[in-house]
Amino acid sequence: MIFTFSGCGENKLSPINVYTDLGVLPIQAHRGGGLRIPENTLETFIETWEMGIIPEADIRTTSDDVIICIHDKNSKRLAPNTSDSLINISFSEISLAVAKTLDVGSFRGDQVQSIPTLEEVFKSMSGHPDRFIYLDYKKIDLDRLANMVRDHGLERQIIFTTKHHNLIIDWHSRIPESLSLLWIGGSLENVKKTFASIRENQFEGITTIQIHVKYPDVESDQPFKPAPDYLQARMKEVNEQGILFQVLPWRMVEPEVYTQLLELGVRSFATDYPIMTIDIYKKYMESI
């Protein structure tokens, strides 16, 4: 049976039901594992899957046209021990062989870890239907990516992730059964502008919408921004479309923030603190 995720209000299987049926919590580990462990490494992805949640992978292409998982444009932050001749060079200008020599694990612990190819990640997902992954798009040829996904039989395990609705529509035309996430950051004005645009386009192809939640302005009496009333209104609108509403509390580590969001009705998170988020989520859901 094949389910298509059209992002409209029609009868369809909700992403949260897909996850629940496979014993996966609707929680995204930002950049693969949050701030606790290395970013975008295969070891991190596996650890996150074993926690029962979903890693995010950032994808780029090397000079020899291999898709790799890495967030930054160069190795300066993630592999600070890189030689001076390479540290500021874009990954798009170095080969896979060179990229594989970089240690992207030690900046966050003692472990030495390398940059994985997307092919390596996909191989680790094949045969494991509970291993989902958010693929945060960064200038990858969509036809090539779609072919890779189909070759590995991962059409329903990939969550195509971007802030550009037109890219989700393009992706959905290639793999209509794929999940997707549109993330919305920046100012409240930008959030409103983005919602107006996707509303005009009938939320086409979107199965999850993520809003970034941040600390309030100093003069504000609200617990976070956007304010709870605005979040609830957008959540209601999104849910009516059969779309999963997700929030990313940006660098917010206070447990009470997550509890307040759950009390508002939020049922999906992206987080830099997955262990804490899992604990709060499970305890809250057991209490209701």
Residue ranges of each PLM-predicted region?
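Bacterial N-terminal signal peptides
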Residues: M1-T4
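Phosphate-group recognition and catalysis centered on beta-loop-alpha active-site segments
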Residues: G7-I288
